[in-house]
Amino acid sequence: MREIVHLQAGQCGNQIGAKFWEVISDEHGIDPTGTYHGDSDLQLERINVYYNEATGGNYVPRAVLVDLEPGTMDSVRSGPFGQIFRPDNFVFGQSGAGNNWAKGHYTEGAELVDAVLDVVRKEAESCDCLQGFQLTHSLGGGTGSGMGTLLISKIREEFPDRIMNTFSVVPSPKVSDTVVEPYNATLSVHQLVENTDETYCIDNEALYDICFRTLKLTTPTYGDLNHLVSATMSGVTTCLRFPGQLNADLRKLAVNMVPFPRLHFFMPGFAPLTSRGSQQYRALTVPELTQQMFDAKNMMAACDPRHGRYLTVAAVFRGRMSMKEVDEQMLSVQSKNSSYFVEWIPNNVKTAVCDIPPRGLKMAATFIGNSTAIQELFKRISEQFTAMFRRKAFLHWYTGEGMDEMEFTEAESNMNDLVSEYQQYQDATAEEGEFEEEAEEEVA
């Protein structure tokens, strides 16, 4: 079986990671003790991807929980599914990273990283054929961003041919914990561009807007934001967890979604959007699902896809529905909005259907888009970064941990390069190459 090892780092990473395990354990019929109480063979057919089967038929998540302070991990352990994890897989320090990327990446995190790699190695060894890793973390703090990216590069060294997939929560001033978030995020993106194969950009700005505008929550809490994250994560991993043909493993997803190695930052979307604890009274139709799924308001990254073009798209429909109708709707979206899909990648939209819907919904759809509009998100962080960096504000926290200003400048220019690359492919047309060749022939 093709297994995935899950890592969660830092406060945010552990909170959304814990929610992820609650949601998928529920979908696979696994209770908090790890016992199976499901009602469908589909739930067990690919259970090995995320779970180890222990003695006595108990299922244990292939999860490694990491933090530089014990607080969040204690609350995960005492949470609803806290007892399902392997106790040895909790790896934590005592000092904390204090929202400082340098502490997570170079000092405190570097001391803990070998202990984490030992656990990762152990999990990888119990796999029959490991396909890759997924990490949940935020880019705004110290541990998830600094130590998370350190873990990625260390795992990359040791498992160079395995896929590295991250769920990265991008900071926003609307839901801000600290003033140095733009620094931490820029330094992290600098690492993610080079070291991951696929990154789902989960943008706090977008999550906040969805809660506020669509779900009409006047003061969204982290619980509300995490509810959206867990729905999205459950959706984008559906193809990996349930039997199916399309994007059935991380590598096939990467092949379909990533046309150029650096451009692997995806914009996830979800439909229908529901608030925590609410029930859906009316099942949506396939056309409604498709329309909502492509709607800018349903995107988990605060970028408007109408400001860019899609390089590639993967859609996952869940629930009992007519495949024919799904195909018709997806084709209709593409033909009506053809200008928003680059024409030099034919068949760049792929659709999968899974019979098992998420809990509480009859039908749902998840969207994964590789759109050039994601540059808006990087521009936003870059502007905030520059505003502080030109004054060298708060830099002493980083240089005090042994970092050099040079590294900030490099990270900044790498992110700006990424923005220009997206822009370049947004403007590219299919004919460009042909004209150049003709011109050369005439000159000759």
Swiss-Prot record:
Q: Which cofactor does it need?
A: Mg(2+)
Q: Which residues form the signal peptide?
A: none
Q: Where is this motif: MREI motif?
A: 1-4
Q: Which UniProt keywords apply?
A: Cytoplasm, Cytoskeleton, Disease variant, Dystonia, GTP-binding, Isopeptide bond, Leukodystrophy, Magnesium, Metal-binding, Microtubule, Nucleotide-binding, Phosphoprotein
> At which positions is Mg(2+) bound?
E69
Reading the lineage from the top rank, the first entry is: Eukaryota
Q: GO annotations under biological process?
A: microtubule cytoskeleton organization; mitotic cell cycle; negative regulation of microtubule polymerization
Question: Where is it localised?
Answer: Cytoplasm, Cytoskeleton
Post-translationally, this protein is described as follows, namely:
Some glutamate residues at the C-terminus are polyglutamylated, resulting in polyglutamate chains on the gamma-carboxyl group. Polyglutamylation plays a key role in microtubule severing by spastin (SPAST). SPAST preferentially recognizes and acts on microtubules decorated with short polyglutamate tails: severing activity by SPAST increases as the number of glutamates per tubulin rises from one to eight, but decreases beyond this glutamylation threshold. Glutamylation is also involved in cilia motility. Some glutamate residues at the C-terminus are monoglycylated but not polyglycylated due to the absence of functional TTLL10 in human. Monoglycylation is mainly limited to tubulin incorporated into cilia and flagella axonemes, which is required for their stability and maintenance. Flagella glycylation controls sperm motility. Both polyglutamylation and monoglycylation can coexist on the same protein on adjacent residues, and lowering glycylation levels increases polyglutamylation, and reciprocally.
Specify whether Hydrolase is a keyword of the entry: no
**UniProt key word Magnesium:** yes
Q: Binding positions for GTP?
A: Q11, E69, S138, G142, T143, G144, N204, N226
Kindly list the positions at which Phosphoserine occurs in this protein. S172
Name where it mostly resides.
cytoplasm
Instruction: Please name every pair of cysteines joined by a disulfide bond in this record.
Output: none
A family per Pfam: Tubulin_C
Q: Which GO terms describe its cellular component?
A: axoneme; cytoplasm; cytosol; extracellular exosome; intercellular bridge; internode region of axon; microtubule; microtubule cytoskeleton
Family affiliation: Belongs to the tubulin family.
Outline the subunit composition.
Dimer of alpha and beta chains. A typical microtubule is a hollow water-filled tube with an outer diameter of 25 nm and an inner diameter of 15 nM. Alpha-beta heterodimers associate head-to-tail to form protofilaments running lengthwise along the microtubule wall with the beta-tubulin subunit facing the microtubule plus end conferring a structural polarity. Microtubules usually have 13 protofilaments but different protofilament numbers can be found in some organisms and specialized cells.
According to the UniProt entry, the note on domains is: The highly acidic C-terminal region may bind cations such as calcium. The MREI motif is common among all beta-tubulin isoforms and may be critical for tubulin autoregulation.
Q: Which disease is it linked to?
A: Dystonia 4, torsion, autosomal dominant: A form of torsion dystonia, a disease defined by the presence of sustained involuntary muscle contractions, often leading to abnormal postures. 'Torsion' refers to the twisting nature of body movements, often affecting the trunk. DYT4 is characterized by onset in the second to third decade of progressive laryngeal dysphonia followed by the involvement of other muscles, such as the neck or limbs. Some patients develop an ataxic gait.
**What is this protein's function per UniProt?**
Tubulin is the major constituent of microtubules, a cylinder consisting of laterally associated linear protofilaments composed of alpha- and beta-tubulin heterodimers. Microtubules grow by the addition of GTP-tubulin dimers to the microtubule end, where a stabilizing cap forms. Below the cap, tubulin dimers are in GDP-bound state, owing to GTPase activity of alpha-tubulin.
Instruction: Specify the protein name.
Output: Tubulin beta-4A chain
Per the UniProt record, the source organism is: Homo sapiens
Q: What is the lineage of its organism?
A: Eukaryota, Metazoa, Chordata, Craniata, Vertebrata
The gene name reads TUBB4A
